[in-house]
């Protein structure tokens, strides 16, 4: 008889914090959603919802253009 496991409900960390729109100037928050090489992490890794993933990618790209975040980290 197979063992039944309860699935954990994933909750978006940004929804849990009550964040509506991600700010490109909040570099510490943006770094949590980039890899050690500076790439934007996918939703399945970070656990954010689709709305916040789009907002995060826009904010990270803006922060890169403003030189707040590097394009590539060594």
Swiss-Prot record:
SUPFAM superfamilies: Ribosomal protein S18. Keywords: Ribonucleoprotein, Ribosomal protein, RNA-binding, rRNA-binding. The keyword Transmembrane helix does not apply. GO terms for biological process: translation. One of its GO terms (molecular function) is small ribosomal subunit rRNA binding. GO terms for cellular component: cytosolic small ribosomal subunit. The keyword Ribonucleoprotein applies. Pfam families: Ribosomal_S18. Coiled coil: none annotated. Binds as a heterodimer with protein bS6 to the central domain of the 16S rRNA, where it helps stabilize the platform of the 30S subunit. Part of the 30S ribosomal subunit. Forms a tight heterodimer with protein bS6. HAMAP family: Ribosomal_bS18. Belongs to the bacterial ribosomal protein bS18 family. This is Small ribosomal subunit protein bS18. The lineage of its organism: Bacteria, Pseudomonadati, Coprothermobacterota, Coprothermobacteria, Coprothermobacterales.
């Amino acid at each position: 008889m197979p063992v039944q496991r309860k699935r954990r409900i994933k909750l978006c960390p940004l929804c849990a914090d009550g964040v509506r729109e991600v700010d490109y100037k909040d570099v510490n928050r943006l770094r949590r959603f980039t890899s050690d090489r500076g790439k934007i992490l996918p939703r399945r890794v970070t656990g954010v919802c689709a709305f916040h993933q789009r907002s995060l990618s826009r904010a990270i790209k803006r922060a890169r253009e403003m030189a707040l975040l590097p394009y590539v980290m060594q």
